[in-house]
Swiss-Prot record:
Record-linked Pfam families: YozE_SAM_like
Species this protein is from: Staphylococcus saprophyticus subsp. saprophyticus (strain ATCC 15305 / DSM 20229 / NCIMB 8711 / NCTC 7292 / S-41)
Membrane spanning stretches: none
Name the UniProt record assigns to this protein: UPF0346 protein SSP1318
InterPro entries according to UniProt: UPF0346, YozE_SAM-like, YozE_SAM-like_sf
Protein family membership: Belongs to the UPF0346 family.
Lineage top rank: taxon: Bacteria
Gene3D superfamilies linked: YozE SAM-like
């Protein structure tokens, strides 16, 4: 089982030609993003209130779901 932060996983989505790739780029460009965080609620709250993200929160939900699956392997 992996023990990486969501930020680390999001970097693997950079370069995708979909909304998840766009979100990953926005996360990468956000210097204040909580890079060591794993908790869904803390990350979701940050994206909703602190970040300046143009992507729908449902895209974050989907990417976080991929993250939880990725951690299992």
């Amino acid at each position: 089982m992996k023990d990486h932060s969501f930020y680390h996983f999001a970097l693997t989505a950079r370069g995708r030609k979909d909304e998840k790739g766009e979100l990953a780029e926005e996360i990468f460009d956000d210097l204040s993003f909580p890079k060591h965080e794993k908790d869904f609620h803390i990350l979701s709250d940050y994206i909703e209130t602190q970040g300046h993200y143009t992507i729908s929160l449902s895209v974050f939900d989907d990417l976080y779901e991929e993250y939880t699956e990725w951690l299992k392997f």
